[in-house]
């Protein structure tokens, strides 16, 4: 009879402990109801990227001296630089410059080490395509400046996201 009573007592204690754990979890769930939603409706709403965001590379053809530093510092030797040596002026003349964004890892080394600052990172990150060969950008495609997310009137930018709140109030 005694083991049966202690078994019921253990069962009662385990039931109370389980109810307490369920109550703690439910209180955490209820505490999240006052928070703002984190998700956004992507095609219609976009977050504003930070100024250090590494998006598509912008290339200025006139500034490039065909030194190939970008190719040497790239971990995957990605930029393709075609040039011709002009013997009468003893300088390289750039013929073609291209980057395949299907392979690019967006490390930013090419932008950081470029001596003439002809490469820069933009805030463009939409590379959706059905054909991977469309991700190979030549100097003409790299030279186009993308439309800023802030200037695009067709979408709504989200200013009160948790990321921007932390940047504005770093002490909170």
UniProtKB/Swiss-Prot annotation:
It comes from the Eukaryota. One of its GO terms (molecular function) is iron ion binding. Residues 55-84, 95-124 form the 4Fe-4S ferredoxin-type domain. Binds 2 [4Fe-4S] clusters per subunit. Keywords: 4Fe-4S, Chloroplast, Iron, Iron-sulfur, Membrane, Metal-binding, NAD, NADP, Plastid, Plastoquinone, Quinone, Repeat, Thylakoid, Translocase. GO terms for cellular component: chloroplast thylakoid membrane. It holds the Pfam family Fer4_9. [4Fe-4S] cluster 1 binds at residues 64, 67, 70, 114. It is found in: Plastid, Chloroplast thylakoid membrane. Disulfide bonds: none annotated. It is a peripheral membrane protein. It catalyses: a plastoquinone + NADH + (n+1) H(+)(in) = a plastoquinol + NAD(+) + n H(+)(out); a plastoquinone + NADPH + (n+1) H(+)(in) = a plastoquinol + NADP(+) + n H(+)(out). NDH shuttles electrons from NAD(P)H:plastoquinone, via FMN and iron-sulfur (Fe-S) centers, to quinones in the photosynthetic chain and possibly in a chloroplast respiratory chain. The immediate electron acceptor for the enzyme in this species is believed to be plastoquinone. Couples the redox reaction to proton translocation, and thus conserves the redox energy in a proton gradient. NDH is composed of at least 16 different subunits, 5 of which are encoded in the nucleus. HAMAP family: NDH1_NuoI. This is NAD(P)H-quinone oxidoreductase subunit I, chloroplastic. It comes from Olimarabidopsis pumila. The gene is ndhI.
